[in-house]
Regions:
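Extended beta-strand/beta-hairpin segments
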Residues: 1-50, 57-140
Length: 140
């Protein structure tokens, strides 16, 4: 099933404004300040973070279920770091921090399955050009 997102930018880079939609229920506005100066509003990197956290959580849950250890819950926080490199904005790091409630599994197995999910979720694969993607995984 194709997924669709739409964005429109009006005006110059530093003074303009943008809007985006994704699916039926996600939408917002963004500006230069919300993207590069931690100002109010959304930015594309937040959407990447949410997409990565969601995809990773589902991939980890599926892997654990296939291994015979159904999940009560998996929560993942993703932090996308955007920095200027040689004067151009570059996503330099994505940090995934995941916690799971998985009865009947030990920490080492959970971490192993989390590493597999990080390598194999479709969004991780799409972000393969990011220089560093880190993972912290623990059981609750």
């Amino acid at each position: 099933m194709p997924a669709k997102g739409t964005a429109e930018w009006k005006g110059g880079l530093q003074t303009g404004t943008g809007t985006f939609t994704a699916g039926d229920s996600i939408g917002g506005g963004f500006t230069f300040k919300s993207r590069f100066e931690d100002g109010p509003g959304s930015n594309p990197e937040q959407l990447i973070a949410a997409a990565h956290a969601a995809c990773f959580s589902m991939a980890l849950s599926a892997a654990l279920e296939r291994a015979g250890t159904p999940v009560e819950s998996v929560q993942t926080d993703a932090t996308v770091t955007l920095r200027l490199v040689d004067g151009a904005p570059v996503i330099t790091n994505i940090a995934l921090v995941t916690q799971g409630r998985v009865p009947g599994i030990d920490e080492a197995t959970f971490v192993k399955e989390a590493e597999g999910a990080k390598a194999n979720c479709p969004v991780s694969k799409a972000l393969a050009g990011v220089p560093e993607i880190t993972l912290e995984a623990s059981l609750l």
